[in-house]
């Protein structure tokens, strides 16, 4: 899938906290989904930024987590021990999200699809897909390995 680098310097951001600050810009929608665990290295500052977006409940160890942040505000967020799913339409594009942490199962799963095309990798952690509503395109797909460190995979 071709990505446009229309999010300015967010693509250069390698720290999850700085990345969260950058994706709160107007004109962007960010989709977040946890695979296996995305909480161990989620810090207090990360949680404050998510709270400013309207996400008051963040995942704890191996919980499922989904969020959609549009223009810096949460359109949807959910955390739990069961498999979570959510569907929405942005810019006439269908987005489908799924998160299954490893809290009570050995079968962790994660998916973010746009028009039935998978956008995530099989890596564990916090998956983030960013969509530019002005340019009508995806601008980033990244996984932060918050279960073991604060590294990222593109």
Predicted regions and their residues:
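Single conserved hydrophobic/aromatic residue that forms the stacking wall/gate
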Residues: 1-11
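Divalent-metal-activated hydrolytic enzyme cores
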Residues: 48-142, 147-148
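Residue-level detector of short, conserved catalytic/binding motifs and their immediate flanks
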Residues: 8-9, 29, 65, 126
């Amino acid at each position: 899938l071709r990505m446009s680098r229309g999010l300015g310097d967010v693509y250069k951001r390698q720290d999850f906290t700085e990345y969260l600050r950058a994706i709160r810009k107007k004109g962007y929608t960010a989709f977040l989904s946890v695979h296996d665990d995305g909480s161990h290295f989620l810090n207090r500052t990360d949680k404050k930024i998510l709270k400013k977006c309207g996400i008051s409940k963040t995942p704890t160890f191996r919980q499922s987590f989904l969020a959609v942040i549009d223009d810096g505000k949460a359109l949807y967020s959910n955390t739990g021990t069961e498999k979570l799913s959510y569907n929405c339409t942005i810019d006439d594009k269908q987005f489908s999200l799924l998160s299954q942490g490893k809290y009570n199962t050995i079968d962790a799963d994660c998916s973010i699809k746009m028009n039935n095309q998978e956008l995530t990798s099989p890596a564990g952690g916090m998956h983030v897909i960013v969509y530019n509503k002005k340019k009508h395109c995806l601008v980033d797909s990244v996984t932060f390995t918050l279960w073991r460190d604060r590294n990222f995979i593109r």
